[in-house]
Amino acid sequence: MPLLDSFCVDHTIMNAPGVRLAKTMDTPKGDKICVFDLRFCKPNETMMPERGTHTLEHLFAGFMRDHLNREGVEIIDISPMGCRTGFYMSVIGEPSSQEVANAWEASMKDIINVLSQSDIPELNEYQCGSYKMHSLKEAHEIANNVLKAGIGIIDNESIKLDLHAKGLKKH
């Protein structure tokens, strides 16, 4: 099994909140795709609550598109990490990490301004696979925590994992 890019960084020294350009690739037609690690919580120390993460997923996807999409840049997908410490965002185009951080900050402010559960997009049994598993209160707490801490830029080289030095193997 190949070692995935996300497992080549040392999670013990990764700061959060932070934006990390996790991967870039070219499509067969030459379009650039960037995958960003949007780390909300310091790995292995804290994680986002399940219901709040789900609500954030519904809100964050739209707000990030509002703030980041432009000519030559379009978000493909934003998905929560299984570890609940962040989201992965795939983008056509090459926004800078600072542009992503600015859009993320603006999105957190937008989320705080959502005042009612009824304002959460696609919150119904037809469009959501777990429509009862939401918490706007928890989403607000997550957004407030990000804004309070500030969003940094994470450099891949500074957190590169030396598998050999840590006694780890590639599987």
Swiss-Prot record:
Superkingdom per UniProt: Bacteria
Q: What is this protein called?
A: S-ribosylhomocysteine lyase
Task: Give the Enzyme Commission number.
Answer: 4.4.1.21
Gene3D superfamilies reported for this sequence = S-ribosylhomocysteinase (LuxS) (3.30.1360.80)
Q: How is the cofactor bound?
A: Binds 1 Fe cation per subunit.
Provide this UniProt record's keywords sorted from A to Z: Autoinducer synthesis, Iron, Lyase, Metal-binding, Quorum sensing
**A GO biological process this protein is involved in?**
quorum sensing
Q: What class of enzyme is it?
A: lyase
What catalytic reaction does the record list? S-(5-deoxy-D-ribos-5-yl)-L-homocysteine = (S)-4,5-dihydroxypentane-2,3-dione + L-homocysteine
Species: Campylobacter curvus (strain 525.92)
Q: Which residues bind Fe cation?
A: 54, 58, 128
Q: Which Pfam families match?
A: LuxS (PF02664)
The answer to whether the entry has keyword Membrane is: no
Member of which family? Belongs to the LuxS family.
Question: Which purpose does this protein serve, as stated in its record?
Answer: Involved in the synthesis of autoinducer 2 (AI-2) which is secreted by bacteria and is used to communicate both the cell density and the metabolic potential of the environment. The regulation of gene expression in response to changes in cell density is called quorum sensing. Catalyzes the transformation of S-ribosylhomocysteine (RHC) to homocysteine (HC) and 4,5-dihydroxy-2,3-pentadione (DPD).
Keyword Metal-binding (UniProt)? yes
Give cofactor(s), names only. Answer: Fe cation
